[in-house]
């Protein structure tokens, strides 16, 4: 079980999430890997999760009718949200809002085929009070096996 240096799934997700719309991260996505990117902003963490799950399904990053894929994605999203929110998933209840870019990457980061596929979710953007100018940058990463 050796992590391939060119197949660092978390790094790829972070670079995709950090890239501005007019930037193209210089990435060589391994053959057979899938990914999607998008934006989400809300005071509701459920809406943040739903937007990313919908993007992953509509871009065929995960299969819609396979529970374990949705479950793996959910845990990767929650892990990334913990990073952005410093372990406090609450947003609206404590008057916080987020504006995030996200990337979801699915692939095989290990050289052993038995290790299977993994999913990485990267979030980058701002979090703060729902007042323009009262936010700061935040970043989060979640990785889970499928």
Curated annotation (Swiss-Prot):
<comment type="subunit">
    <text>Homohexamer.</text>
</comment>
<keyword id="KW-0369">Histidine metabolism</keyword>
<keyword id="KW-0805">Transcription regulation</keyword>
<protein>
    <recommendedName>
        <fullName>Hut operon positive regulatory protein</fullName>
    </recommendedName>
</protein>
<keyword id="KW-0694">RNA-binding</keyword>
<dbReference type="GO" id="GO:0010628">
    <property type="term" value="P:positive regulation of gene expression"/>
</dbReference>
<dbReference type="GO" id="GO:0006547">
    <property type="term" value="P:L-histidine metabolic process"/>
</dbReference>
<dbReference type="InterPro" id="IPR036482">
    <property type="entry name" value="Regulatory_HutP_sf"/>
</dbReference>
<dbReference type="InterPro" id="IPR015111">
    <property type="entry name" value="Regulatory_HutP"/>
</dbReference>
<dbReference type="Pfam" id="PF09021">
    <property type="entry name" value="HutP"/>
</dbReference>
<dbReference type="GO" id="GO:0003729">
    <property type="term" value="F:mRNA binding"/>
</dbReference>
<keyword id="KW-0010">Activator</keyword>
<keyword id="KW-0804">Transcription</keyword>
<comment type="function">
    <text>Antiterminator that binds to cis-acting regulatory sequences on the mRNA in the presence of histidine, thereby suppressing transcription termination and activating the hut operon for histidine utilization.</text>
</comment>
<comment type="similarity">
    <text>Belongs to the HutP family.</text>
</comment>
<dbReference type="InterPro" id="IPR023552">
    <property type="entry name" value="Regulatory_HutP_bacillales"/>
</dbReference>
């Amino acid at each position: 079980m050796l992590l391939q240096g060119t197949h660092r799934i978390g790094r790829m997700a972070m670079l995709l999430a950090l890239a501005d719309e007019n930037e193209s991260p210089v990435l060589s996505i391994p053959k057979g890997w899938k990914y999607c990117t998008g934006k989400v902003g809300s005071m509701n963490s459920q809406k943040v999760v739903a937007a990313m799950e919908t993007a992953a399904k509509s871009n065929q990053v995960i299969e819609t009718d396979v529970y374990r894929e949705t479950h793996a994605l959910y845990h990767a999203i929650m892990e990334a949200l913990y990073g952005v929110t410093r372990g406090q998933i609450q947003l609206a209840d404590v008057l916080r809002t987020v504006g995030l870019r996200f990337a979801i990457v699915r692939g095989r980061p290990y050289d052993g085929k038995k290790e299977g596929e993994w999913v990485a979710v990267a979030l980058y953007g701002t979090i703060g009070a729902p007042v323009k100018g009262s936010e700061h940058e935040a970043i989060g990463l979640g990785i889970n096996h499928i």
